[in-house]
Amino acid sequence: NMKIPFSPPYIDANVINEVVDSLKSGWITTGPKVKALEEEIGKISGVKNVLCINSWTSGAILMLRWLGLQPGDEVIVPAYTYSATAMAVLWAGGKPVMVDSTEDFNISVEGIKNAITEKTKAIIPVDIAGFPCDYDAIMELVKSEKIKALFHATSEIQEKLGRILVLSDSAHSIGAHYG
């Protein structure tokens, strides 16, 4: 009976010391360490405004609400993933539509194609175990004239985007490269 760790956290003495330092400082959410992290991420990524939050789930809820998700709007998610992906859709007021995976455990592009309706506002592919989803094929699909013709914007943000939003979740693929 062999145990193979799927996603073990890296916690050394330095990580522990930083956590203890943060706890002792009295700032555990929006303090100076978070601000420094936001600035560092901004420098590395070349992004002007960075906002760190507590989890990907909270970020997904914010993104879906920013998108203008309404009750009855559909968001395509993989059937093989952590429940937080579908829960974020529910918490944002939408309806998750689950699509099966392929042999690499990532969401099926053909399944996405078959699941898209006039109510589809977003797709949340989830990269599994360091293997990114086929974003080229997903983006080609959502940018195709046939799929864009199905898309009906119901918010200013959706109007500007002009297509279904693709919101990537790479929770178990940090450090993986696509392309």
Model regions and ranges:
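PLP-dependent aminotransferase-like
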Residues: 65-170
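N-terminal "arm"/small-domain region of PLP-dependent enzymes with the aminotransferase-like
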Residues: 1-28, 32
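Short, polar loop motifs at secondary-structure junctions
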Residues: 171-175
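Short, intrinsically disordered, charge-balanced linker/junction segments flanking boundaries
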Residues: 1, 176-179
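Phosphate-binding glycine-rich loop
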Residues: 27-74, 88-91, 98, 146, ...
